[in-house]
């Protein structure tokens, strides 16, 4: 079996590349996917989002090694093992990231990935409803919507931010990210609008695209050129040949793992596992980054939250309405208000993100208290902590060793203390007076730095945004894995294009930026001239040097 291009992974970037590389019919594409089909309400119903990421059917089941700076806790690292990859199990929140994130990419060695370069690709991929005119795409495959925001708590959150002196923004994905405003969702006609729905399924209707189920074991190399992929399907092994290129889009966990299994990575580590070294790239698996967050929860004095919908009868009613009509409480992820804020004067652009929910709920989807409540998910966006993904063995079926080194930089603790206190300030504004009850978490007794630190150590969780393990950079950067056209340095015919190539984590959720990577990488792979650079300038708070708001 062979094709012009062989893509490993049907996730956010992989699906986009399958669509674009096959678009004009000149080239054949094979997509290798180990996961299951994305069928059923647990995947497609937006409100069911807490289920697929906690089910081994749809998730690779990764977790970290015990993290020493948060009391030895091991945190889960969900990655989608399903058509659409993590875009089929995520929270459906759409965030481009801030313009300065991409300017930093370019300045750090990823030339051609500044905001002016990537904005045209965001526009090409978007089909935005309600976004800022002139800044958003309206004809792309990826549908983006805003929720109805029919719960008054969503508006109280935004008004409270305004009362506290912060900016308000009507479109954080437009000219102005900073401020409080509506959150955007990858939902269309009441369904999760994953990369599979947006890109892969339309591509699979073309005669030049084929989906192959199997586990990618290693890249097949002839000398220093990639010529195919060895896969395992059932108990049989086979090789899929690539006439032109192999493209890895297997996630920030599996992409570096696959490179290392193929002899591309830190030489000493490869030799330790008996793997022949093809290219000594010490950066493979390094530079691992993520966003962490905590939940700040309040009781609500009015019975207007989703707490009343958590009983079995209400869930059945919600499910039935969604199954028959794709409407109602099942047709939203319930993340409908958000904020991007700067932590202090001297910070040029937002470094704190908020998701607001009109319910107080735990990570497993159960009520945090036997009462009505609401909560904010809050965390810093640019932690200095860095981790790694390394091989546990040379067995492709064995999970890698994942160490994020969460909270290992002293700034992380100060940042999170500020997040907790800032959220209390926001919840204490007059806009919440009609609704605010007692604080559920951390609790009113948690006040001092030590008390807040202990709360963080026990309760901080991943926002599930791992990235950076195959860093894009200049070819003379010893820690770069791919160049600015996503080509693996030192190997021909091989690229990586997914969130693993991010030099630094972007400001917000990563599905949107990962799809953008797939879009832009496609033009590089096809040898096309990149889309014309944008001359639009993002809004930067004129008071950023003297005020945090």
UniProtKB/Swiss-Prot annotation:
EC numbers listed for it are 1.1.99.1, 1.2.1.8
Gene Ontology MF terms in the entry = betaine-aldehyde dehydrogenase (NAD+) activity; choline dehydrogenase activity; flavin adenine dinucleotide binding
Superkingdom of source: Bacteria
Q: Which reaction does it catalyse?
A: choline + A = betaine aldehyde + AH2; betaine aldehyde + NAD(+) + H2O = glycine betaine + NADH + 2 H(+)
The pathway noted for it is: Amine and polyamine biosynthesis; betaine biosynthesis via choline pathway; betaine aldehyde from choline (cytochrome c reductase route): step 1/1
Q: Which residues bind FAD?
A: 4-33
Q: Where is the active site?
A: 465 (proton acceptor)
Does the keyword field hold Nucleotide-binding? no
Pfam families per the UniProt record, alphabetical: GMC_oxred_C (PF05199), GMC_oxred_N (PF00732)
Keywords for the protein's UniProt record, in alphabetical order = FAD, Flavoprotein, NAD, Oxidoreductase
Cofactor(s) needed, names only, are:
FAD
Q: Name one GO biological process term.
A: glycine betaine biosynthetic process from choline
Member of which family? Answer: Belongs to the GMC oxidoreductase family.
Role summary:
Involved in the biosynthesis of the osmoprotectant glycine betaine. Catalyzes the oxidation of choline to betaine aldehyde and betaine aldehyde to glycine betaine at the same rate.
Record's protein name:
Oxygen-dependent choline dehydrogenase
Q: What is the source species?
A: Brucella anthropi (strain ATCC 49188 / DSM 6882 / CCUG 24695 / JCM 21032 / LMG 3331 / NBRC 15819 / NCTC 12168 / Alc 37) (Ochrobactrum anthropi)
């Amino acid at each position: 079996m062979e094709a012009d291009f062989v893509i490993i992974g049907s996730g956010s970037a992989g699906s986009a590349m399958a669509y674009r590389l096959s678009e004009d019919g000149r080239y054949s594409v094979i997509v290798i996917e180990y996961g299951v089909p994305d069928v059923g309400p647990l995947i497609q119903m937006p409100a069911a989002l807490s289920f697929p990421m906690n089910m081994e059917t749809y998730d690779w089941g990764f977790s970290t090694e015990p993290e020493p700076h948060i009391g030895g806790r091991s945190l889960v690292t969900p990655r989608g093992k399903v058509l659409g990859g993590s875009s089929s199990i995520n929270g459906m929140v759409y965030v481009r990231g801030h313009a300065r994130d991409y300017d930093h990419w370019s300045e750090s060695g990823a030339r051609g990935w500044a905001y002016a370069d990537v904005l045209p690709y965001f526009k090409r991929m978007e089909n935005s409803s309600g976004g800022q005119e002139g800044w958003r795409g309206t004809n792309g495959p990826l549908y983006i919507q805003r929720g109805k925001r029919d719960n008054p708590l969503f508006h109280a959150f935004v008004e409270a931010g305004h009362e506290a002196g912060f900016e308000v923004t009507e479109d954080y994905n437009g000219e102005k990210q900073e401020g409080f405003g509506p959150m955007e969702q990858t939902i269309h006609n009441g369904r999760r609008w994953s990369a599979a729905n947006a890109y892969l399924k339309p591509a699979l209707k073309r005669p030049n695209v084929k989906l192959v189920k199997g586990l990618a074991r290693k890249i097949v190399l002839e000398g220093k050129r990639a010529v195919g992929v060895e896969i395992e399907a059932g108990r049989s092994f086979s090789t899929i040949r690539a006439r032109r290129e192999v493209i890895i889009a297997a996630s920030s966990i599996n992409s570096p793992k696959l490179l290392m299994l193929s002899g591309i990575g830190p030489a000493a580590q490869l030799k330790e596992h008996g793997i022949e070294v093809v290219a000594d790239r010490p950066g493979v698996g390094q530079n691992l980054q993520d966003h962490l967050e905590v939940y700040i929860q309040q009781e609500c004095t009015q019975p207007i939250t989703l707490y009343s919908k958590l009983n079995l009868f209400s869930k059945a009613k919600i499910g039935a309405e969604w199954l028959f009509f794709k409407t109602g409480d099942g047709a939203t992820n319930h993340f409908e208000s958000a904020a991007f804020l700067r932590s202090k004067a001297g910070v040029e652009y937002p470094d704190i993100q908020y998701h607001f929910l009109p319910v107080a709920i735990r990570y497993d989807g159960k009520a945090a208290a036997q009462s009505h409540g609401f909560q904010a998910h809050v965390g810093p966006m640019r932690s200095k902590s860095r981790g790694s993904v390394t091989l546990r063995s040379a067995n492709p079926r064995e999970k890698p060793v994942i160490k994020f080194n969460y909270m290992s930089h002293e700034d992380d603790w100060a940042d999170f203390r500020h997040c907790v206190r800032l959220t209390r300030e926001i919840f204490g504004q007059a806009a919440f007076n009609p609704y605010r009850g007692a604080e559920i978490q951390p609790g009113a007794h948690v006040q001092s730095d030590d008390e807040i630190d202990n709360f963080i150590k026990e309760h901080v969780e991943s926002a599930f945004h791992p990235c950076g393990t195959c860093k894009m950079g200049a070819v003379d950067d010893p820690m770069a894995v791919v160049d600015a056209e996503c080509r693996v340095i030192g190997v021909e015919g091989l690229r990586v294009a997914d969130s693993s190539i991010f030099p630094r984590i972007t400001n917000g959720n990563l599905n949107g930026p990962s799809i953008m990577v797939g879009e832009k990488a496609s033009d590089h792979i096809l040898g096309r001239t990149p889309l014309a650079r944008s001359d639009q300038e993002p809004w930067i708070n004129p008071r950023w040097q003297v005020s945090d708001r």
